[in-house]
Amino acid sequence: GVFEGKTLGTPIGMIIYNKDQQSKDYSNIKDVFRPNHADITYQAKYGFRDYRGGGRASARETANWVAAGAIAKKILKKEGVSVNGFVSEIGNIKADSINYKDINNKYFFSDESKLSDLDLMFDGLIAEGNSVGARLGVVVENCPVGLGDPVFDKLDANLAKAIMTINAVKSISIGNADNLLDLKGSEARDEITSSGYSSNNSGGILGGISNGDNISLSFIIKPTSSIKTKGKTLNADGKEVDIEVNGRHDPCVGIRAVPIAEAMVSLVLVDHLLINRAQCASIDQKLPFSE
């Protein structure tokens, strides 16, 4: 579907070969269920499972999503839309400031003053054979107004579904949702002025439709479940056994998820951009703000 660097309008096909797999790392756990993994649910649902890393429950599944997201990002760039992902919390280390532009560190962390603390944390986790979770964020700049449907395909609902599809994600918040319980209605409402919105607690989406402000969301990824710390589980015969998962596993899978989240958000936005163009091309979708 690509010729001389341009799409042809035909389906685009891609194959990503995994040439660095080490399936033997999983041979000692092929008959036991890893705690907090999909092993037990896949086995119950299908009566069979791929124990070599979890099959489609593995984050390897997301490699093709990121590839497709690269195409979506190119479409959004032509529209002036940018999608920016970052990590704001890892374990008990929280960013004091959020800078989602020009992040250039191996943790995708938004506060570079915390990098030495993160290095110490990761060294300790590796030595201990343990893991921690993370909070990630995505900010979409210059999103046009009007994307999303009012009921069954709300933009925030589709974004939530896309993010929750990512492995190990356990919750998502749109806008300032985590703090809304502490605010009164007079504080939480995003008042409208002639120059724009006075705040963005809604995260750029109202009634399932983008309102022209930045779209912001955050989500939490659980600690890596495959760890070297010994734990309890059952084997295929239903007997209680100890488990210790060897192999190459991250102390925090959250740092791997930034490009995945950017890709998923980009794919949802492109879908809605094209749908909105088809449905509302004859409507002048303007906000009543002063230029």
Predicted stretch roles:
Residues 226-291:
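Internal helix-turn-beta structural module
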Residues 45-151:
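Glycine-rich, mobile lid/loop segments that gate access to catalytic sites or pores
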Residues 59-81, 153, 157-161, 213-221, ...:
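Alpha-helical support elements that line or immediately flank enzyme active sites
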Residues 129-240:
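Glycine-rich anion/phosphate-binding loop at the beta-strand->alpha-helix junction
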Residues 1-41:
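Glycine-rich, N-terminal phosphate-binding loop and its surrounding beta-alpha-beta segment
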Residues 1-3, 49-61, 145-149, 202-206, ...:
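A short glycine/serine-rich beta->alpha loop
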Residues 30-56, 231-251:
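Short acidic, glycine/tyrosine-flanked loop/strand segments centered on an H-E-D-like triad
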